[in-house]
From Swiss-Prot:
<keyword id="KW-0627">Porphyrin biosynthesis</keyword>
<dbReference type="GO" id="GO:0030170">
    <property type="term" value="F:pyridoxal phosphate binding"/>
</dbReference>
<feature type="modified residue" description="N6-(pyridoxal phosphate)lysine">
    <location>
        <position position="272"/>
    </location>
</feature>
<dbReference type="GO" id="GO:0008483">
    <property type="term" value="F:transaminase activity"/>
</dbReference>
<protein>
    <recommendedName>
        <fullName>Glutamate-1-semialdehyde 2,1-aminomutase</fullName>
        <ecNumber>5.4.3.8</ecNumber>
    </recommendedName>
</protein>
<dbReference type="GO" id="GO:0042286">
    <property type="term" value="F:glutamate-1-semialdehyde 2,1-aminomutase activity"/>
</dbReference>
<dbReference type="InterPro" id="IPR005814">
    <property type="entry name" value="Aminotrans_3"/>
</dbReference>
<dbReference type="InterPro" id="IPR015421">
    <property type="entry name" value="PyrdxlP-dep_Trfase_major"/>
</dbReference>
<comment type="similarity">
    <text>Belongs to the class-III pyridoxal-phosphate-dependent aminotransferase family. HemL subfamily.</text>
</comment>
<dbReference type="InterPro" id="IPR015422">
    <property type="entry name" value="PyrdxlP-dep_Trfase_small"/>
</dbReference>
<comment type="pathway">
    <text>Porphyrin-containing compound metabolism; protoporphyrin-IX biosynthesis; 5-aminolevulinate from L-glutamyl-tRNA(Glu): step 2/2.</text>
</comment>
<dbReference type="InterPro" id="IPR004639">
    <property type="entry name" value="4pyrrol_synth_GluAld_NH2Trfase"/>
</dbReference>
<dbReference type="InterPro" id="IPR049704">
    <property type="entry name" value="Aminotrans_3_PPA_site"/>
</dbReference>
<keyword id="KW-0663">Pyridoxal phosphate</keyword>
<dbReference type="GO" id="GO:0005737">
    <property type="term" value="C:cytoplasm"/>
</dbReference>
<dbReference type="GO" id="GO:0006782">
    <property type="term" value="P:protoporphyrinogen IX biosynthetic process"/>
</dbReference>
<keyword id="KW-0413">Isomerase</keyword>
Amino acid sequence: MIRSHVSADTMNLNSSRSLYERAKRLMPGGVSSPVRAIRPYPFYVKRAEGPYLWDEDGNSFIDYCLAYGPMILGHRNPEVMRKVEEQIERGWLYGTPTALEVELAERIISHYPSIEMIRFVSTGTEATMAALRIARGFTGKDKIVKIEGGFHGAHDSVLVKAGSGATTIGVPDSKGVPADTAKNTVLVPYNDIQAMEAALREDDVAAVIMEPVLGNIGPVLPMDGYLEGVRRITEEHDALLIFDEVITGFRLALGGAQSYYRVRADITTLGKIIGGGFPIGAVGGRREIMENVAPQGGIYQAGTFNGSPVSMAAGLATLDILERGVLDRINEMGSYLRKGISDIVEDLKLDYSVSGVASMFKVFFGPLPRNYSEALRCDKEGYLRFFWRMLEAGIFLTPSQYETDFISASHDKEIIDKTLEAFKLFLKG
C-alpha cells in the first residue's frame, strides 16, 4: 500500500530538517551539489538496499533517482559489493597502472566501435572537459557548438547559455566564467538541423558536443533523422562530433545511444554506470585522435584518481551483470512503467506528457517538449507539488521537472505497480 499525503510537513522529517539547518551554516546552500537542495529542505539518506532508500527519520522510499543515474543495478548489489571488498582488501589507491583498468578499457571498447582508445578520469565533468581540449588540440580550432539545455558538467566552456536568436554566441551561465571563454561556445537548439547547419557554416568549429538524449531537461528525445543529420553536417565541415554518454552509456544499450540510434561519434564521454556507483568518468575515441593525449601526444590530461582501482572493480562487476541480458529486462520494465503512466494521463484527461527511452522516464507537466525552450513552458511548481505528494507516498522521484528519472534492475513489476497506483492517485492533483 502507498502512504497517504497531506503536505510535506506531515512527514516525520525532523532529523533531516535539523541536519539541513546545521549544513546551511557549513556548506553553501547546505549541500554539496545544487540539485540536492530540495525545497523547502532535503531528506537525508541513512542507508539503501535494492530499490529502496531509508532516511534519518526512518522513512523508506522507492528510489527512481538512483543517484541521478549510476545505480542501474539498484543499491548494494551483492556482486558489486564483493568485488569492491576484494579490491579494498588488496588496497584502494596505488598511483600506478592496474590490470583492472586494462580490463575495463577492453570491455568498454568491445561494446563501442567508435572508441579505439580511452582515458579514465574521475567524473563526468572531467571527461567532457578533456573531450573539448582533445577536440581543440586535434583540430587546431577553438569554437565549440553546444546544444541549448544540454548538460556537460561544471566547467567554464559548457557553463554557457544562449543569447538571442536561434544560433548564438554563448554568454556565461555562471558568475566566474570569463566572457572570452563563453564567446568560443556557440549555442543551438536541440532537434534543429537548420540551426546546426548555420552554426558550422563558418568552418571554424572544433567540435559539436551533445547528449544524444537530453538528460537534464527531461529526457527529451531526438527526432527521427536528427542525430544522423548532425553526424552528416559535422563531417561536411570537418568538425568532430562528441557524444556525451555519461547518462546514456550502457543504459540505452550495451553500446549506449550510439548502438541504439546507430550513429557513431568521433569522441565519446562516459561516466555514472561504468563506475558501478563509484566516482568515474572516461573519454574515448578514434585512435588517430586519442593518440594525441599525453603522454603519447601533446594534449595534457592527468589526475591522481584516474583509473581508481575501486571504481574499476565496481565498473567491471556492473558490466559483468549487464552483459547477462539484465539490461533488456530493465528496459522492458521502463517500457511497462511509461505505458502505465501514459494510460493514467490519458484516462484522467490531463494536459501532461510522458517521455523516455529504455530505463529513462519523466512526466512533463505540459506538452511533450522537443527542445529546451519548449521544456521551460512546463508547470514547474505543479511538478514540485507532485514530487512532494509522491515522496509522502514513499516514492522518490527526481525533485526537478528537468531531471530524468531512472529504473534499476531492482525495480520489479510489483514495485512498479505500486508506483503506478501512486501516480494515479496523485496526478489528479
